[in-house]
Amino acid sequence: MNMPLLLLIAIVVVSLSHGNGEQTDLTRETFPAGFVFGTASSAYQVEGNALQYGRGPCIWDTFLMQPGVTPDNSTANVTVDEYHRYMDDVDNMVRVGFDAYRFSISWSRIFPSGLGKINKDGVDYYHRLIDYMLANNIIPYVVLYHYDLPQVLHDQYKGWLHPRIVRDFVRFADFCFKTYGHKVKNWFTINEPRMMANHGYGDGFFPPGRCTGCQPGGNSATEPYIAAHNLLLSHAAAVRTYRDKYQAIQKGKIGILLDFVWYEPLTDKEEDHAAAHRAREFTLGWYLHPITYGHYPETMQNAVKERLPNFTREQSEMIKGSADYIAINHYTTYYVSHHVNKTSISYLNDWDVKISYERNGVPIGKQAYSNWLYVVPWGIYKAVMHVKEKYKDPIIIIGENGIDQPGNETLPGALYDFFRIQYFDQYLHELKRAIKDGARVTGYFAWSLLDNFEWRLGFTSKFGIVYVDRSTFTRYPKDSTRWFRKMIKSEV
């Protein structure tokens, strides 16, 4: 008997005797009929084969060439090799009982040069993935853009800082609609545009690493707003293309994924309530207000003034109503209080808030492995109800929700993720409460399927419900997958 098989037997035996407290009163039947349970990933984090099979470089490939960008100096050149092992991953979804898989298409795998010559290997890969999903009754939810701009477009015209990006993104989107739209009925244009605008152009934490004082250059007072403006226009123009050319025939839907931390006032002071309002407007409202009402929030207009770009009348009309559903990526909640910091002008300082993780010495919630993530289940209820009440009661999808563990945990201990089971159970209870109170939530995607490459944290942080042995790429489902199976399939 070989060692991998012996290890697998040991894991199964220990797991069965581990007593992981998986009981829950949640079942599929406690959610509305047709509610979609799924899991999620992104191309850059799971595919690997970064410069193989015709794929061109993206801005993350270039960014990660610098030593020390990730704590473990890891890259996503190989990551968890879903490019070759997508069948294993879909099979695991089927075993759990998931209805859907949210994944992204790598722009530079389809168009290595941003546009122009098509990479047939890349096109064929996504056909294989989608076809295998459909053959196994897993619904594709496809994201067109998840952080991974083709490097050539940044080199040519600074990417999201230039209006030309709108035209190029629409051409890429149009190709995807035309090529996959007869099989894909659920689209998202862009994942977390705020994160790209802030980290790519505000503090330099993400590629292209631009900010005031950053080595590549930049202006933290203006560039985040310019990038966000072009991201919004790209989203809206892609939605218009889909609706004008494809939606009536393909009968699909299209939306956007927006990150949303819930911001709770630190005290009952009026100024802290105003600070929490500003924080929500400068994050979710930055994108969802234009999509709902056709213009930026007045809070931002008053604070940012001439640094905030304006929409033309035509652009405003194009953006307003440019989503069939809104996906919210929600993980955590913070306290905020009023605080003016004018030592420098930047997107983050424009909020005039201070973020806190405790009140009167009491933490807002238990901290996960990541120092930004606290377990605050009631935050998802407030976040969802805020979207319902402020943005005309849209159809809502929870696009991401999850918690991480240290990346150095190994087998079999890494499989015993009771803390993750507790997180999912508590957050789903609060989500169910929001649905009961009238929120039109139609789906929930757990982040993430796999222990994959976690951006600036490399492999030191793991959000997956499936452990991946990176020496063999063997997948080992964690206890949380069994919890989901019992909940979704209503098993005793």
From Swiss-Prot:
Record PANTHER family: BETA-GLUCOSIDASE 38, GLYCOSYL HYDROLASE
InterPro entries: Glyco_hydro_1, Glycoside_hydrolase_SF
Binding site residues for a beta-D-glucoside: Q45, H146, N191, E192, Y331, E400, W447, E454, W455, F463
GO molecular function, one term: beta-glucosidase activity
Alphabetical list of SUPFAM superfamilies matching this protein: (Trans)glycosidases
Source species, domain of life: Eukaryota
Disulfide pairings: C211-C214
GO biological process, one term: carbohydrate metabolic process
Catalysed reactions, as listed in the record: Hydrolysis of terminal, non-reducing beta-D-glucosyl residues with release of beta-D-glucose
The name this protein goes by in its record: Beta-glucosidase 38
Assigned EC number: 3.2.1.21
Classification via Gene3D superfamilies: Glycosidases
Key words of the record: Disulfide bond, Glycoprotein, Glycosidase, Hydrolase, Signal
Active-site residues, Swiss-Prot/TrEMBL: E192, E400
Glycan attachment points: N73, N77, N310, N341, N408
Signal peptide: 1-21
Family according to the record: Belongs to the glycosyl hydrolase 1 family.
